[in-house]
Regions:
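C-terminal substrate-binding/catalytic lobe of Rossmann-fold NAD(P)-dependent oxidoreductases
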Residues: 1, 85-88, 93-224
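N-terminal Rossmann-like NAD(P) cofactor-binding subdomain of oxidoreductases
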Residues: 1-114, 218, 240-242
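Short FAD-binding loop at a beta-strand-to-alpha-helix junction that anchors the flavin cofactor
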Residues: 62-63, 220-231
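A generic structural signal for alpha-helix starts
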Residues: 71, 167-168, 234-235
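Short, hydrophobic alpha-helical segments
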Residues: 164, 244-245
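Conserved, well-structured ligand/cofactor-binding cores
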Residues: 194, 231-232, 244
Length: 245
């Protein structure tokens, strides 16, 4: 009975009400808005804070905050697409295991997801790259990828390889990302790292994404590889609050 408690916005983090149709139950119980902490089917908008939150309007009632991986990827993709253009790209997220995985080998319709999260690197599907097209419509259908779940408890890593629309260099790519991280638009959302750090160093980092300039590669002028770290729990939680406010 949200109305009895004066609840304005429900942060839907159960994973059970991830479509607009299901999330409407919160509105029926008196809430005014619902923000889904996952990709949301038929949501009024899919938002990555700092990238397209300007699409929000007062009449929207059910909004998706996308996924933690989309929140890592989109702040990297947006400035690069603006500056040098992205024709097509493929992403891999090296992702810490989560609580929907199993700790011992069990039965599962997905045979890889049936395996112990603590014993293997587990390739699995993700819609994070494709979801960038909901945030940046000009890239709809141009990005794809998969995830590899690994036996670490927190912090994940996006590896994006793309074909640029023009020739570029490592130095230019890093300069674009450094400027983006310092911009009013992405300050606090996108970080920039040029030190030889590892995943644990980004635990409790509030950024959605921290670009790693030490790993940027360019081959033949137009084939570009970039990487970014993200605390898939803490950073995403901060963006839920930013979007809600």
């Amino acid at each position: 009975p949200w109305g009895e408690y004066g609840v304005d916005v429900v942060l839907e983090c159960t994973g059970a009400f991830t479509s607009k149709e299901k999330a409407l139950v919160h509105l029926e119980q008196g809430a005014k808005k619902v923000l889904i902490s996952a990709p949301g089917k038929n949501a009024d908008a899919t938002v990555v804070y700092g990238v397209n939150d300007d699409v929000l309007t007062s009449d929207m009632t059910v909004v998706s905050n996308a996924s933690c991986t989309t929140n890592c990827l989109a702040p990297v993709v947006a400035p690069l697409h603006e500056a040098i253009g992205i024709e097509r790209g493929l992403m891999t997220t090296i992702h810490s295991y989560t609580n929907d995985q199993v700790l011992t080998d069990v039965y599962h319709k997905d045979l890889r997801r049936a395996r112990s999260a603590t014993h293997s690197m587990i390739p699995t599907k993700t819609g994070a790259a494709a979801a960038v097209g909901l945030v940046l419509p000009e890239l709809n259908g141009k990005l794809d990828g998969f995830a590899v779940r690994v036996p670490t408890i927190n912090v994940s890593f996006v590896d994006l390889t793309f074909t640029a629309k023009r020739d570029t260099t490592v130095e230019e790519v890093n300069a674009i990302m450094k400027a983006a991280a310092e911009s009013d638009r992405l300050k606090g959302v996108l970080g920039y790292n040029d030190l030889p750090l590892v995943s644990i160093d980004f635990n409790h980092d509030p950024h959605s994404s921290t670009f790693d300039a030490t790993l940027t590669k360019v081959s033949g002028g137009r084939l570009v590889k970039v990487t970014s770290w993200y605390d898939n729990e803490w950073g995403f939680s901060h963006r839920m609050l930013d979007t809600a406010c």
